[in-house]
Amino acid sequence: MNVSSMIERLVHDIYCLTPKKLVLCCFLAVVAYCFLCRKYAGRRWLRPCLGGLLALWLSAVLWITVFSRSTGNTEAHWLPLSTYWRILSGESRELLRSAFMNAVLFFPAGLLLGGLLPGHRSFRWQLVCAVICFGLISLGIELTQFFNRLGNAEFDDVLHNTLGAAAGLAAFHVKWSD
């Protein structure tokens, strides 16, 4: 079994989790992350480790969304919130799961970014940084998928990914509040 098939299997297994199990796994990961950040706060090696984890996360996301896909048909849905209109019109409820999974995919990025950004900056400043940074990354992924015919390109994916990153950043700040 090569690395590519192992990654595909892992992604498939994660995607097939029920939403309750996925939320539970995310919650446990956040608790573990918060515990480690609090325990090792102020250590010199913590930020480089978080930066490395963020780079690893970005590599995994690019692998999942761009490099592991083969070319084929592509559709573009650039109308904001079109996913919800399509669900209400009777299309597959799988679209709702896909929206949720897009948010979950970017949640770790916001969590990691919270540990990397300077602590003396306000939450609002950090939130703007996260929205711009991960919004542009997500837009880049969607445009790459569209122009290389690697799947559907949707504005809603950019929205859900960005909301997931913002939720991760908010989770980081909730843990540090007194």
Identify the meaning behind each predicted range:
Residues 1-150, 155, 166-178:
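Bulky hydrophobic segments
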